[in-house]
Amino acid sequence: MVPLTTLDYPGMLACVLFCQGCAWRCRYCHNPDLIAPRGSAEIDWRRVLLFLQRRQDLLDAVVFSGGEPTLQEGLPAAMDEVRAMGFRVGLHSAGIKPAGFANALRHADWVGFDVKALVEDYQLVTQVKGSGVANWRSLETLLASGVDYECRTTVHWHLIDTSRLLRLAQRLQASGVKRFAVQMVRTASMLDEQLPIAPAQMALPELWGCMRELFPAFVLRG
């Protein structure tokens, strides 16, 4: 749990709750301890609710992150409990299971949606067959829902090059995405220890200029 952040829900003071478990094995994952279904640092839900009760006058929102939170069967009920306390509800997801994502989406005020790559390149990142189809199907659900969102792509320059990143942005724009963020990978801790550390190459004004023309809202994060 992160008790206070201004980064994980735009414009909101938020608490982030990290849900255990993920079905993908993204090579640059910087939270590999959250992949297993059970973890060593689990917090009882009652303790979380007590913490939130004490922060009702300080926090605006609670973000459910992971791992992949939509794999948790109890997520929708937990989201409703948080909303009943007066908080806005954020969700970080890659839409791993489209049905589970669609169910959780109905309980969210805002979604930070991860798009790893072009559909055809997904397995290079996630190491899971069919992951691209699932992700983009969930993206369609998100865009049709009317729920506020940000789509974001984590860039590791050994897994995606500038031409593919631009093609990804163009495909997102053609799909109806209005808000897109590119964020450089965190290399301090990665699931694939053999993956080379890629410099955070950000001095690409032509590429970022093209993306700013594609989207009404574009953000570049180091």
Where are these regions (language model features)?
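Short acidic, glycine/proline-enriched helix-loop-strand junctions
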Residues: 189-222
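Conserved AdoMet/S-adenosylmethionine-binding subsite of the radical SAM
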Residues: 49-61, 70-196
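Glycine-rich phosphate-binding "P-loop"
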Residues: 34-40, 61-68
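Flexible, glycine- and charge-enriched loops at secondary-structure boundaries
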Residues: 41-42, 128-132, 197-204
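Short catalytic helix/loop segments, enriched in acidic residues and glycine
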Residues: 46
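Conserved Rossmann-like nucleotide-binding pocket used by diverse enzymes
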Residues: 18, 65, 181
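Canonical Radical SAM [4Fe-4S] cluster-binding loop centered on the CxxxCxxC motif
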Residues: 7-43
